[in-house]
Amino acid sequence: MGSQEVLMDATKLASYSVILQILFRVLTFALNAFTLRYVSKEIIGIVNVRLTLFYTTVVFLAREAFRRACLSHSAQQSWRHTIHLTWLAVPLGICWSFILGWIWLQILEVPEPEAIPYYNIGVWAFGFSAVVELLAEPFWVLAQAHLFVKLKVVAESLAIIIRCSVTVILVLLCPQWGLLIFSLAQVLYTSALALCYIAYFARFLGSLEAEKKPFPLRRMREFLPRFSSSQAFLDWKQAWLAWSFFKQSFLKQILTEGERYVMTFLNVLSFGDQGVYDIVNNLGSLVARFIFLPIEESFYVFFAKVLERGKKVQSQRKEEISMASEVLESLLKLVTLIGLVIIAFGYAYSHLALDIYGGSMLSGGSGPVLLRCYCLYVLLLAINGVTECFTFASMGKEDVDRYNYVMLGLSLSFLCLSYYMTLWLGSVGFILANCFNMGLRITHSLLYIMRYYKGSPYQPLIGLLPSPVVVCVLAVSAAVTGYSEVALCCDKGWLLCLGHIVVGGLCLLVTLGAAVLSEKKLTHFIRSHLLSRHQRKEQ
């Protein structure tokens, strides 16, 4: 498959993933807004922070390293060895479920049974759901590697709809069940997800479509691990790469979910405050989840397939390295512009957004300040996602091992900084600590990219510099919307609040127009690779 075809499939995957993330977040926010009226914020804190952290930790530590190693491009790649490697995620997930389950029940603070019953059942249910999801890992890796873009969207959409439907029905009919509702919904979610992948490949293999595609498997039983006396069970080069990523996964998980670990292990916030923080945090991460994460996941596949891992620029094929440089520059430009727009408009609309979503419980106190700080974090999160996407896709094993030490230092500094800044500033301290560490991670990735392209004519990092016209328009928009908030929002009635929204909409249109007119190269990239598929369909 040529680099152009890989790029088209990767952009298609990103588009579908954005749709999936929008569906997921819209349903999640609607569900949170609904459940806030029927269950306590303490239960929301337990589910969204404590139990979800348990589940994501098990899943991440069990599969992340295998995913990165198995999706890396190699001319000698054997899919039999790859499948064997992905199956190791299941026993690893079982081990982590028992180890972390014991910690969650015996070491951490346990809520009072009278206030929040069924906590023990909730812990084991979320651990079981993680193992169920890992059963679909071989199918997920094959689907992702061969860019089955619609499968992921359909599977996760159905699973999300099932979870939300079960939660709403049980909250209405049996609100006294508390954590049992969310535990059952979580198990059904991962079960539906795994069954969708298995059912799809059961139908796909043996069909005419499978015969036409260069798919490496022909029967379902080939997904199962097989021992052979004439062939090694694993590709040890691939296994050692996975081991390097596995060591790194501990540190990356701490950096990704650091504030939740601090909340969970150090008890700096009550369960109720954790619930409020999580809701505000989710609202602040809307764009990150809608756009940035799908871009990172999809274009990691692109970079991993186009670039030879561990090789210098001079050793790469010219067409591939040129394409990778162009894509990296355009992605950096895109996410930087989106992040700057969020900063410019986020300050003036944070209070209104929280007031609409959760009322005075969220818009009062530190909620608006927290969301405004999160706008800066979103910009850093966007840039880091793209730079690390390229970095991890091009690093060799030795580079990954060296980066593990960097991650160790970042993890330790982040935990210490989060703890002390939270004691000093409350929940806002979490966001500021995240900003500091994200800045350090970006700096490391930028230095790596500069070394990677040193001695070549390519300069993809200029994508971090928006045009002066766009910067000026953003500054004016921030000033206008800031004045609009003071004059029209948020305690002056809904009619004036609507006027504040109209002012922001007009400023946003002007900003988008300035970006389209001044960022010609980015506009061409979006039209060529993100919109061309829809244009071909219309023709």
Curated annotation (Swiss-Prot):
Which cellular compartments is it found in?
A: Endoplasmic reticulum membrane
Which chain regions cross the lipid bilayer? 16-36, 42-62, 85-105, 121-141, 168-188, 189-207, 283-303, 334-354, 376-396, 412-432, 433-449, 460-480, 494-514
Coiled-coil annotation reads none
Q: Which InterPro entries match?
A: RFT1
Membrane topology of the entry? Multi-pass membrane protein
Q: What does this protein do?
A: Intramembrane glycolipid transporter that operates in the biosynthetic pathway of dolichol-linked oligosaccharides, the glycan precursors employed in protein asparagine (N)-glycosylation. The sequential addition of sugars to dolichol pyrophosphate produces dolichol-linked oligosaccharides containing fourteen sugars, including two GlcNAcs, nine mannoses and three glucoses. Once assembled, the oligosaccharide is transferred from the lipid to nascent proteins by oligosaccharyltransferases.
Instruction: Give the protein's recorded name.
Output: Man(5)GlcNAc(2)-PP-dolichol translocation protein RFT1
Q: Where does this protein come from, organism-wise? A: Xenopus tropicalis
- Lineage start: Eukaryota, Metazoa, Chordata, Craniata, Vertebrata
User: What gene does the UniProt entry assign to this protein?
Assistant: rft1
